[in-house]
């Protein structure tokens, strides 16, 4: 844990169909400790904070990595620590691969995408752009939460719907959906001090596969019992503590 005078900049990278609201409970705890925090709304998320953001036309690993690099340079950030959740973990990994000198030696992967999505699901995912947001939010939330989140389902669902309320456009949403199921962290190569934090009941990533990815990058891995993929909603206090102890 760092002291108050040496706090590094933290750059949070949200997941697909998310925006900065999804990580806000965790982010606020770090703000309260005095950390410099950046948490942009990354396309296809609508820019709810009216920030000056880079333009994203290339919804690929290189495109997203370059978007993050441009954001870092445009805001004069001094090698921020990347903290990526879900699809954000792929973006963080892509950035570490392509622009390692722009970011800190430490990198955090929350609910890391540790394995490729089955091919039959890949063909279905882009179709969600044509379904009502409330319906998709309900189905996705119901599927992704673990045991511990079930008693807070309504609260979690409200945040999920808030995050998915508005996108840049349908074309971007489809492109991002395709990106989200084409990559896994293991597709990239980088030499960073990695921290993996995942729910033990994550339905998108088997614990055994997440362990393999952590081993590849010689990273520290922590599983949160009874939590699913949405650890940022289910156990924000514990997630904050796990990140904070390794900063």
Which residues make up each language-model segment?
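Conserved alpha/beta-hydrolase catalytic His-Asp/Glu region
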Residues: 118, 135-189
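Conserved HGGG/HGGXW glycine-rich cap/lid loop of the alpha/beta-hydrolase fold
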Residues: 5-50
